[in-house]
Amino acid sequence: MKQVDTITVTELHEMASKMYGNLVKVDVDVAKETVIVDMEMHADGEAYLLENGSKQEDLWGINLHPDNFGSDDFIEFDSMINLKPRQGNTSRDVLDTDIHAKIVEIVNRVVTQ
């Protein structure tokens, strides 16, 4: 697990091959625009971010599929840490369109070819 400011698709492929084969788990702090990659569970990255000053309501889990870079299937919004009933997010997806868009914006800035 590591915090990244930028990461290449090649690095994501390497991470995916060592853990899940076709995906890399990622946590995003939408307020601080912090990105944590390469953990076994989203909860691991969530714990790290909370220990380092992030707020629970700002943390969202996604999966990146390096083989699908450049397509709509690159980012998968599916994580247990996304279940936030008090924020109206009753799904493993990210239902708030503004938060969803912010995550896409952050990922598009951080991940390079």
Which functions belong to the PLM regions below?
Residues R92-Q113:
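Well-ordered alpha/beta subsegment
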Residues D5-Y48:
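Negatively charged, low-complexity tracts enriched in Asp/Glu with abundant Ser/Thr
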Residues T8-A16, P85-D96:
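Short histidine-centered catalytic/ligand-binding loop motif
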Residues P66-V94:
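Intrinsically disordered, low-complexity regulatory segments enriched in Ser/Thr/Pro
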Residues L23-V30, I75-F77, I103, V107:
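Generic structural hydrophobic/aromatic packing signal, biased to beta-strands
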